[in-house]
């Protein structure tokens, strides 16, 4: 009994110590008296594009517990497969392309229709034909049971072993078409790659939730590459000297890789990319023949889940937010707002993240509001807007203009108002809650509408008639007209 009591006392002491350490790791990190529109602080150049990184040590990003990155992939550029230590949500800001994910433990569901003969060159036939068969195979196997999927995986392994002496068909996990407006949710540890098959740059922005319960490391983004090599390294991240960032296969000895993959040592050395200085975005020479579904102009409407087919291997991870006909708030003369949460994309319930897409016309205003359950990171994709943000002390901590490519972090509870100053202002907003709640200060569903007139009149020392106008004059819920440029001065601080 005494031993059990000692063990219990020790466990409680450790928990208290760890809790205290976590709480004191970043003391007062959200006591912000000024916010800034942020630009990328580091650029990692590659053969067919670049990766632009925001400084996650910036106070407002530390408060939100996130990091932010922008991938710019040139035509025929391939972003090599990598995985992250935490949940992330990406948004396709420009262009189109292909995306592939490899979910651990899941079998291949796309199978090629053409047979590859060793020494015959490319194993791929015409893209359209193989795509239709790949889609059929994906749907058929994706709804199969676990044992059937395991059987397919074993069959693929058997085909791979036999491929040294006879023909075989390539098999891999799901490949999707992506386009502007697509929002992509990804689990930690899921390897992901992108390919630009269009004629213009493919621009993808992503937020990583460093404070996620799924991140068991520190509050630093850790990207693990399966292929390629970054000659510039991550000195900006870890404070180390300038040294390349190699892929994870580089750390193993060639002999171990040769035994694991059943290949010769020379090929194993090639997997380590030691002499490869192309970076993490490489240019594909010739056709890019992967199995893909046929491209459709519009995505089919999702059917109601039946509780059987939705597994970690087949879970939908993308949704498009650029279609006004599917908007949650739409006014032809003002603009629209589309919300993506776990009710629309169930995978977000596990990731505890959500997104909002906004597009408003000049002089349209998003009514003052705050998020009661999440931090938010706003990225401008097009145009310009005037934004004011107010903290818990009643100080205006941001009062200025944001433009395309800039980032603004808005902590939980901070109130914000946006007004478009260009012909069109468009943004994507990432939130650290699967079902973030918005509370408005003015409008039909606002906090003012919920207060009695007597409370408003006495609280602000105004007449009942003035209180009535404050409460009822704004009939909109989210978007309204702005009368024109307001007075925007320097951030206002409380009197000393």
UniProtKB/Swiss-Prot annotation:
UniProt keyword Nucleotide-binding present: no
Xref: Pfam families: Cupin_1 (PF00190)
Cystine pairs: 30-63, 106-313
Keywords: Disulfide bond, Phosphoprotein, Seed storage protein, Signal, Storage protein
Modified residues (Phosphothreonine): 109, 432
Gene3D superfamilies in UniProt: Jelly Rolls
Modified residues (Phosphotyrosine): 336
Start and end residues of each stretch annotated as Disordered: 114-170
SUPFAM superfamilies, sorted: RmlC-like cupins
InterPro entries: 11S_seedstore_CS, 11S_seedstore_pln, Cupin_1, RmlC-like_jellyroll, RmlC_Cupin_sf, Seed_Storage-Functional
MF annotations from Gene Ontology: nutrient reservoir activity
Bias (Gly residues) ranges: 122-154
Annotated signal sequence range: 1-23
Residues that bear Phosphoserine: 338
Disulfide bond keyword on record: yes
GO biological process: seed maturation
Span of domain Cupin type-1: 35-269, 319-468
Entry function: This is a seed storage protein.
Family: Belongs to the 11S seed storage protein (globulins) family.
Quaternary organization: Hexamer; each subunit is composed of an acidic and a basic chain derived from a single precursor and linked by a disulfide bond.
Identification of the protein by name: Cruciferin BnC2
Gene that produces this protein: BnC2
């Amino acid at each position: 009994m005494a031993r059990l009591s000692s063990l219990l006392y020790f466990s409680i002491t450790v928990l208290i110590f760890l809790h205290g350490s976590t709480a004191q790791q970043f003391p007062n990190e959200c006591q912000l008296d000024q916010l800034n529109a942020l630009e990328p602080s580091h650029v990692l150049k590659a053969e067919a594009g670049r990766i632009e990184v925001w400084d996650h040590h910036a106070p407002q990003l530390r408060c939100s517990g996130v990091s932010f990155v922008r991938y710019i992939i040139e035509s025929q550029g391939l972003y090599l497969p990598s995985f992250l230590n935490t949940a992330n949500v990406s948004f396709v800001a420009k262009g189109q392309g292909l995306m592939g994910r490899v979910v651990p433990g899941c079998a291949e569901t796309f199978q090629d229709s053409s047979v590859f003969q060793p020494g015959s060159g490319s194993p791929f036939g015409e893209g359209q034909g193989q795509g239709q068969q790949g889609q059929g195979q994906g749907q058929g196997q994706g709804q199969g049971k676990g044992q059937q999927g395991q059987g397919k995986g074993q069959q693929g392994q058997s085909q791979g072993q036999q491929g040294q002496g006879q023909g075989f068909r390539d098999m891999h996990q799901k490949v999707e078409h992506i386009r502007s407006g697509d929002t992509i949710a990804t689990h930690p540890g899921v390897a992901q790659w992108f390919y630009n098959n269009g004629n213009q740059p493919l621009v993808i922005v992503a937020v990583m939730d460093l404070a996620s319960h799924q991140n068991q490391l520190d509050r630093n983004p850790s990207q693990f590459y399966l292929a390629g090599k970054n000659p510039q390294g991550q000195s900006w991240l870890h404070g180390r000297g300038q040294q390349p960032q190699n892929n994870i296969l580089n750390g193993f000895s060639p002999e171990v890789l040769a035994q694991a993959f059943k290949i010769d040592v020379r090929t194993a050395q090639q997997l380590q990319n030691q002499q490869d200085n192309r970076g993490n975005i490489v240019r594909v020479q010739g056709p890019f023949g992967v199995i893909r579904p046929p491209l459709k102009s519009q995505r089919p409407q999702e059917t109601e889940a039946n509780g059987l087919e939705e597994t970690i291997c087949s879970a939908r991870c993308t949704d498009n937010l650029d279609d006004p006909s599917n908007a949650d708030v739409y006014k032809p003369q003002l603009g629209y707002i589309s919300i993506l949460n776990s009710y629309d994309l169930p995978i977000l319930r596990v990731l505890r993240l959500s997104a909002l897409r906004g597009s408003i016309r000049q002089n349209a205003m998003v009514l003052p509001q705050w998020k009661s359950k999440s931090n938010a990171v706003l990225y401008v994709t097009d145009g310009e807007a005037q934004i004011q943000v107010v903290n818990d002390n009643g100080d205006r901590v941001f009062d200025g203009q944001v433009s395309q490519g800039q980032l603004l972090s808005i902590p939980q509870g901070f109130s914000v108002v946006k007004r478009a100053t260009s012909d069109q202002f468009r943004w994507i907003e990432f939130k650290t809650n699967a079902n973030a709640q918005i509370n408005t200060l003015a409008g039909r569903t606002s906090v003012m509408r919920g207060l009695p007139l007597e409370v408003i009149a006495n609280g602000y020392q105004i007449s009942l008639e003035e209180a009535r106008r404050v409460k009822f004059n704004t009939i909109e819920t989210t978007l309204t007209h702005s009368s024109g440029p307001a007075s925007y001065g320097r951030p206002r601080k409380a009197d000393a």
